[in-house]
Amino acid sequence: MPANRSAIRIRDAESVRVVTLDRPERRNALTPAALDALEAAVSGTDRPVVYLRGAGPAFCAGADLDVVADLDGPAAEEFAERGQRVANAIEDAESAVVAGIDGPARGGGVELALAADLRVATPEATFAEPGVKLGLFGAWGGTVRLPRVVGEGEALDLALSGRTVDADSALRMGLVSRVTEDPRAVADELADNDAETLRAVKARMRDDAPAEVQERRETEVFGRLVERHADAIADRRDS
């Protein structure tokens, strides 16, 4: 990669931060430095929506195997922890995060997409967890999120076989939210909604507190939003 080009590119529109994995010659494989830059890009914005995409014909090949090949055990653990921090940053971001997946998503690329709020694929997208073929597995939170998203049976099938699934199969198993020619349009669709409400919905959906605590928080936030939008609600009622 040329020294003057970052592996992560940021472009801020009015309501959407576009974060591009920008290493197309390596199918956007991620080094430790790129992971750190990605974490900062996703966390360091007040835009209500973050759109995560890959440059070139792939979404993301996951971890850079040139890096992994040189790691000893402790360094490999640190690299896995780094990837987990990035996935957690995506999941915990105040912004709604949309992963636009065009072309192959492999290994860590799938794991980062799993942390997004919406995974939107083009018809050309494909997905695989091929680590098992190298004697590895997805350690950027994949063993936690994959069964949560698609169910234990589908998750075990993908992770134990390393097989590749196309966009339609990914949609059927719930791995992606939609299949469309223009995933960016979905990010823009979300950004048309009220920013505070987007943050509130994400926070409530991601809340893992006991049910009674979640319900109390839900009512408190709902009350605040009703007060804030009272005029708009009245106008809609009277129209």
Regions picked out by a protein language model, each given a short descriptive name:
Residues P2-A13, G162, D166-A167, R172, ...:
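C-terminal alpha-helix plus adjacent terminal tail
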Residues P2, I8, E91-A195:
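Crotonase-fold acyl-CoA enzyme core
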Residues A37-G44, A89, A185-L190:
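CheY-like receiver
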Residues M1-A55:
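Conserved CoA-thioester-binding segment of acyl-CoA-metabolizing enzymes
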